[in-house]
Each structure stands twice: as structure tokens, then as C-alpha cells.
A protein has these predicted regions:
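Intrinsically disordered, low-complexity segments enriched in serine/threonine/proline/glycine
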Residues: 14-17, 37
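Bacterial signal peptide processing site
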Residues: 27-29
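N-terminal compositionally biased, intrinsically disordered segments and leader/signal-like regions
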Residues: 8, 31-34, 50, 138, ...
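Intrinsic-disorder/low-complexity signal
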Residues: 76-204
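Repetitive, low-complexity intrinsically disordered regions enriched in Pro/Gly/Tyr/Ser
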Residues: 33-51
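C-terminal motif of bacterial Sec signal peptides marking the signal peptidase cleavage site
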Residues: 22-25
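Extracellular calcium-associated, cysteine-rich motifs in secreted modular proteins
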Residues: 47-82
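Bacterial N-terminal signal peptides that target proteins for export
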Residues: 2-15
């Protein structure tokens, strides 16, 4: 299992403040809302590529971490949940990539703590070739209703523990964020083994 002392140490170590790593681009208001809360565009970490929106109304979802059919939800019908807030990570190698979403209360949802008191859930934890199941390489965190107001932070980590060496090499990832029935953003980043980075921060 990857639930090792090394993992605990990683979670406890100092990480540069997320907002300090974000691009300096202005954060602009969108027309959408999540519940009664105004949604603003996420701030994106340096080196993260913003994916230009590309979807087709009525298209089949491809289970790729994107909204393929323009309905504001990510990968519905792919075996994991949507909600008033959804963060979905996808990749296409045998790597074991982990998604971390920290809510405004400071609780982090990830494989070692898959629910939060604010109502967040990790309902799909993929281990790539480390899991041996052949399951889809997707991780998904969602709030079905009433996500708390405040700033959310999203990080990803390429697990490279001694219990599983996949030799998957650098792995491109896609991450999308949906709130209140609209896509806030979609992002690409290529991780290397044992790398953990902040991807985005966004307020609701």
C-alpha cells in the first residue's frame, strides 16, 4: 500500500504558499453562480497551461477530465459524481497521480481523507498500474450541494513510493473545475515522478 510514512511526511512538509505561485493575471467575475455565490475565475500556478474550451452540445463524454458536451458537468456517466462543485483529474499512463482539494475551512480531501465536514467527497481514487485493477485513471472530488464560501486550493502529486514503481515517466494530466453548472477552467500540466505542485486556487 502507498499509505506510508513517506506520504505522511509529504503532507506535513512546508509548501510555498499557493497564492504566491499564481499568475499575476487579473481575476475577473463570470456571469455564473454557485448557489447564491458569485464565481470568479481561478488563479493558475506558474507553468500550468490553460486549456481552451472545446466542446460539442450533445456529444458523448470521453471520460477525459473535460466537459465534452458543454453542459457544465465533467465526465457525467463515467462512474463518478458531479455536483454543485466538482474537481476532476485525468491522465493516460500507468502512473499513480493523486488529487488534493483543500476547502475554505482548511480541510484537505485526498486518498487518505476522502470526506470533509463541509460535504466534500473523493469518490474515485485511481492508482494506475499500482492498483492492478485497470480502472480509469481519474480522481474526482465533489460537493453535491452547498460547498462552503471561501477559497479552494487544488494540488496534484505523482506518487513514486518504493511500494510501486510504474516506470510511467513524465505524465501529462488534465484537470477541470466545475461550479454552479459551468466550467470555471480546464488545465494541463506534465508531472514527473514524486513531483507535487499547486494547480489552481479559486473563490466561491
Amino acid at each position: 500500500m502507498k499509505r506510508s510514512v513517506k506520504t505522511i511526511g509529504l503532507l506535513g512538509m512546508a509548501v510555498a504558499p499557493l497564492l504566491a505561485l499564481m499568475s499575476a493575471a487579473c481575476v475577473t467575475r463570470t456571469a455564473g453562480t454557485a448557489g447564491s455565490t458569485v464565481v470568479v475565475q481561478p488563479q493558475v500556478a506558474s507553468g500550468v497551461t490553460v486549456v481552451e474550451a472545446s466542446c460539442t452540445p450533445g456529444a458523448q463524454e470521453q471520460c477525459n477530465g473535460l466537459d465534452d458536451n458543454c453542459n457544465g458537468a465533467i465526465d457525467e456517466g463515467c462512474g463518478y459524481s458531479s455536483g454543485q462543485l466538482q474537481v476532476t483529474l485525468a491522465w493516460n499512463t500507468g502512473a499513480d497521480i493523486d488529487l488534493y482539494v483543500t476547502d475554505p475551512n482548511g480541510e484537505t480531501i485526498y486518498y487518505g481523507s476522502n470526506t470533509s465536514s463541509s460535504g466534500g467527497h473523493l469518490d474515485h481514487d485511481a492508482r494506475g498500474n499500482c492498483g492492478g485493477s485497470g480502472a480509469a485513471t481519474v480522481e474526482n472530488v465533489f460537493w453535491a450541494n452547498n460547498p462552503p464560501r471561501g477559497t479552494y486550493k487544488v494540488e496534484i502529486h505523482y506518487w513514486a513510493g518504493s511500494d510501486c514503481s510504474t516506470n510511467a515517466g513524465p505524465t501529462p494530466t488534465t484537470l477541470s473545475i466545475s461550479a454552479g453548472g459551468r466550467i470555471l477552467g480546464a488545465y494541463n500540466y506534465t508531472l514527473v515522478p514524486d513531483q507535487r505542485i499547486p494547480i489552481a486556487a479559486f473563490p466561491l
